[in-house]
Each structure stands twice: as C-alpha cells, then as structure tokens.
C-alpha cells in the first residue's frame, strides 16, 4: 500500500475514486 499524497484528517479522501482509502489520517491505495 502506497500513500496517495492526500490526508484525511478533516475531509475524506478524494482519491477514493481511484481506489484509495483512509488509514491513520492518510490516504493509501
């Protein structure tokens, strides 16, 4: 799992549309 370059502390991951998910306040693929 690689970081998607996005955090999800205050807002959800926009990168969920490309298969990323929130883990420990960071978006991972």
Curated annotation (Swiss-Prot):
PTM annotation, UniProt: Contains 3 disulfide bonds.
Keywords for the protein's UniProt record, in alphabetical order: Disulfide bond, Knottin, Plant defense
Covalent cross-link Cyclopeptide (His-Asp), where: 1-29
Disulphide bonds in the chain: 4-20, 8-22, 13-27
GO BP: any one term: defense response
Family: Belongs to the cyclotide family. Bracelet subfamily.
Main function: Probably participates in a plant defense mechanism.
Domain notes: The presence of a 'disulfide through disulfide knot' structurally defines this protein as a knottin.
Protein name, per record: Cyclotide cter-L
């Amino acid at each position: 799992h690689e970081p998607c370059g996005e955090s999800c502390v205050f807002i959800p991951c926009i990168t969920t549309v490309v298969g990323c998910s929130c883990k420990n306040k960071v978006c991972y693929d």
